[in-house]
UniProtKB/Swiss-Prot annotation:
Belongs to the PurK/PurT family. Mg(2+) binds at residues 267, 279. Keywords: ATP-binding, Ligase, Magnesium, Metal-binding, Nucleotide-binding, Purine biosynthesis. Signal peptide: none annotated. HAMAP family: PurT. The gene is purT. SUPFAM superfamilies: Glutathione synthetase ATP-binding domain-like, PreATP-grasp domain, Rudiment single hybrid motif. It catalyses: N(1)-(5-phospho-beta-D-ribosyl)glycinamide + formate + ATP = N(2)-formyl-N(1)-(5-phospho-beta-D-ribosyl)glycinamide + ADP + phosphate + H(+). The keyword DNA damage does not apply. This is Formate-dependent phosphoribosylglycinamide formyltransferase. InterPro entries: ATP-grasp, ATP-grasp_carboxylate-amine, ATP_grasp_subdomain_1, PreATP-grasp_dom_sf, PurT, PurT/PurK_preATP-grasp, PurT_C, Rudment_hybrid_motif. Homodimer.
């Protein structure tokens, strides 16, 4: 039996999100629908998730003393990491002391850097991955480039949403890619991974939910990226039954190895019926924003249900759907959004404005979502809606 309380009272179940971006915002909303009291922690004020939370704290989550202080102050029932830049050693200690880290402190630690999860997937679980080498210095990086070969992909071991990531297509890109990897990652200069370029037909995100009743999968999500940063996604990604079965097998094996309950975003390359593991995050995935319109239970609702121990008897898809991001390309400390009415003129269309208080150059500020007759139609509808929105700087 699962008993839920009432926020703001002695019966409240308390959830603390470590990180408060647009994905965390949707998690907060879903948790509050079930009476959960939500606290958001991030490194700056007025993040999207803070705008809908009961309370918030501004700290560096890499500061072990500060992280421990806010956890011990609030004594949450669930600690839910949402970003990479967290003192994971402190989470391991807190878990040993009885706090519930979602999905587990070990899973959080392994997936917060690409080295931990790549070694788990390739060396322990036995999943096929691209050839890779790690490097701490430019000399090691140049040696790794020689061994892996060109073309290759360069990523900081601690980053997300394409930050610090680039593709080396020729010798002319080598120095630039190193410099960007050291300036663009979540935690500044540091260790990187050099990956061989993978020959694939398409890439998917397979949202995988570990819950009280077992493991469930959403329909596969296809997506398009620019320099590692998501721009469009669609669901379902057409694929053969054999390829889907292989993808689900990979997702099951890696999420079982990580353990705990919650939603995982498993990224896979598909070549014919062959599957190559890319990455996994133990939390909602940006490409999964499409599920806000495509499914009866969005990825955020699934995550919250799994965390709370609630049943997930089925995941129903409404039909082909797509998302298209709303991007800034200017500087503002108070961006506004014009023509939202035009974006929403078509039926089966939604617009989410994330609530990011400032932009300086290219930044995701929102997303348009649409259902369609098929995936191609849904993508066209989503792009029309996102293109209709004009950002005022």
């Amino acid at each position: 039996m699962v008993t839920l309380g009432t926020a703001g009272t002695a019966s409240a179940r308390k959830m603390m999100l470590l990180g408060g971006g647009e994905l965390g915002k949707e998690v907060v909303i879903e948790a509050q629908r079930l009476g959960v009291e939500v606290i958001v922690v991030d490194r700056y004020e007025n993040t999207p998730a803070m705008q809908v939370a009961h309370r918030s704290y501004v700290i560096s989550m890499l500061d072990t003393a500060e992280l421990r202080r806010v956890v011990e102050t609030e004594k949450p029932d669930y600690i839910v990491p949402e970003i990479e830049a967290i003192a994971t050693e402190t989470l391991l200690e807190l878990e040993k002391e009885g706090f519930n880290v979602v999905p587990t402190a070990r899973a959080t630690r392994l997936t917060m850097d690409r080295e931990g999860i790549r070694r788990l997937a390739a060396e322990e679980v036995g999943l096929k991955t691209s050839p890779y080498k790690f490097a701490d210095t430019k000399e090691e990086y140049l040696e790794a480039i020689k061994e892996i070969g060109i073309p290759c992909v360069i990523k900081p071991v601690m980053s997300s949403s394409g930050k610090g990531q680039s593709t080396v297509k020729s010798e002319a890109d080598v120095d630039r890619a190193w410099d960007y990897s050291q300036s663009g990652g979540r935690t500044g200069e540091g260790r990187i991974i050099v990956e061989s370029f993978v020959d694939f037909d398409y890439e998917i995100t397979l949202l995988t939910v570990r819950h009280a009743g077992g493991t469930s999968y959403c329909a596969p999500i296809g997506h398009r990226q620019d320099d590692g940063d998501y721009r469009e996604s669609w669901q379902p990604q057409p694929m053969s039954d054999a390829a889907l079965a292989n993808a689900q097998d990979y997702a099951l094996r890696i999420t079982d190895a990580l353990g705990g309950r919650g939603l995982f975003g498993v990224e896979l390359f598909i070549k014919g019926e062959e599957v190559i593991f890319s990455e996994v995050s133990p939390r909602p995935h940006d490409t999964g924003l499409v599920t806000v319109i495509s499914q009866d239970l969005s990825e955020f609702a699934l995550h919250v249900r799994a965390i709370l121990g609630l049943p997930i008897p089925a995941i129903r898809q409404y039909g082909p759907a797509a998302s298209s991001v709303i991007l800034s390309n200017g500087k503002s400390e108070a961006p506004a959004f014009a023509n939202v009415d035009k974006a929403l003129e078509a039926a089966d269309t939604k617009v989410l404005i994330f609530g990011k208080g400032e932009c300086n150059g290219v930044r995701r500020l929102g997303v348009a979502l649409a259902l369609g007759e098929d995936v191609t139609d849904a993508k066209a509808r989503a792009i029309r809606a996102s293109s209709a929105v004009e950002i005022e700087y």
